[in-house]
Amino acid sequence: MSRRGVTVWFTGLSGAGKTTLSCGVAQQLRAWGLPVEVLDGDLVRQHLTKGLGFSKVDREENIRRIGFVAEMLTRHGVIVLVSAISPYRAARQEVRRYIGSFIEVFVDAPLEVCERRDVKGLYRKARAGLIQHFTGIDDPYEPPEQPEVVCKTAEQSIPECIDLVIQSLKSRGYV
C-alpha cells in the first residue's frame, strides 16, 4: 500500500515564523522516517522562480509554480511543507484545488511583531521606500478564511505550534 502524500502550506507575513515552523515539523517527521520535502519561499525564488518580481501577477505565478512542484511530490506520497508568504487568498485557493490533499497553516503574527523580528532588515527598507510591493507595508496580505491550523506565534511557543501541525496531520491520517 502506498503512503498518502499531503501539502502543508504555511502562509503569513514575512517574519511570522513560517520557515521556523516548517523546518521544525520537517525535523520531527524525518525523525519518524517519513518522506518530507520543504519548499521554502526564499529558496524557491532563488531557483525555481528566479526572474519573477513582486507584482500581483508575478506573485500569483510564483505560487502556481510552487503548487505544481508540491502537487507532484504529494502525488508520490511525500509530505510537502511549503513556507511562502502567498499573500493572495485566491492564489492559495487555486493551489488547494489543484493539489487536493492540502492543509493550510496560517502563521499569524501582528505586523509590529514581524517588524521586530526582521533579521533581514526588509521591513526597514520597505518603510524607507527602498523595497516596493512589500507585503504588509504597501502590498496587502489576505488572511485565510478557514485555515485548518492557526499558529499565533506571538502568543504560542514554536514547539506548541509544531505540535498543532503534527496533530492536524495525525487527525487526517497522514502520519
Curated annotation (Swiss-Prot):
Where does this protein hold ATP?
12-19
Q: Which residues form the active site?
A: 86 (phosphoserine intermediate)
What the entry lists under InterPro entries is as follows: APS_kinase, P-loop_NTPase, Sulf_AdTrans/APS_kinase
Sorted keywords for this record are: ATP-binding, Kinase, Nucleotide-binding, Phosphoprotein, Transferase
What GO MF terms are annotated?
Answer: adenylylsulfate kinase activity; ATP binding; sulfate adenylyltransferase (ATP) activity
* Any Gene Ontology biological process: hydrogen sulfide biosynthetic process
Instruction: Please state the pathway this protein functions in, per its UniProt record.
Output: Sulfur metabolism; hydrogen sulfide biosynthesis; sulfite from sulfate: step 2/3
Enzyme Commission number(s) from the entry: 2.7.1.25
Q: Does the keyword Acyltransferase apply?
A: no
Task: Please state which protein family the record places this protein in.
Answer: Belongs to the APS kinase family.
What PANTHER family does its record include? SULFATE ADENYLYLTRANSFERASE
This chain's protein is named Adenylyl-sulfate kinase
* Species the sequence originates in: Synechococcus sp. (strain JA-2-3B'a(2-13))
Q: What is the lineage of its organism?
A: Bacteria, Bacillati, Cyanobacteriota, Cyanophyceae, Synechococcales
What gene is behind this protein?
Answer: cysC
